[in-house]
Amino acid sequence: MRSEEALKRLHKSVVSCRKCPRLVIYLEEITNRKPKRYQQWDYWGKPLPSFGDPQARLLIVGLAPAAHGGARTGRMFTGDRSGEWLFSALHEAGFSNRPKSDRRDDDLTLSDCYITATIHCAPPKNKPLPQEIENCRPYLLEEFRLLKKVRIILALGQIAFTQTLRSLRLVGYEIPNLPFGHGRLYRVSRREGGKDFLRSDRRADLSTGAVKILATYHPSQQNTQTGRLTRPMFRQIFEKIREEIGEEQ
């Protein structure tokens, strides 16, 4: 219960954050200049909090909210094409009670899964600046501390993968330069007593100082429309997650 309360406080801090002037201005611009198809929407127009199950064993790290997706609806991956792919896959794998979500006040619930992002504000052209990523990093570090049951982290895209590794290093994980690749799975842990960072003799979760990292192409339109990421490829990622979680039970 304490971690749940702490996560709620963290969410409030995220929503009220104004550390990045460029992103604050951009959110105001997209809120005031809605495309015709969304004229009737009351845009969220603020940083987006993470959401999901506080007891989750799966942590998903995305890049950033979409300008007319999450920044409009008020929930990550809600109301955009990437979200359609993600929630469909989560539902099929048993992590979500719905295969689709269009607004934050629907009854979508995540089970054993928690969704966060590298940054919590929609950036212009979907490209956050390095300092903006650093400004948001403390939120991810705090989530690592609070989400103690996480056994596997799914990084959506290369930026999320790189920033996840950097954040884990900051909380004591000894991680070499691991290459990004769709479907690549790594197991890392904190260095203890000079032992190697790879450990096979303990359960992997954030509470024990060991975790698995799985990389995938981001389900962006750029990747899905070109065939770089297909439905079967994305489905296999979540089948792998189920296998890995099952092995740790």
Task: List each language-model region with its residue ranges.
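A polyanion-binding, active-site-adjacent surface
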Residues: 2-182, 195-200, 210-246
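Conserved flavin/dinucleotide-binding core of flavoenzymes
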Residues: 185
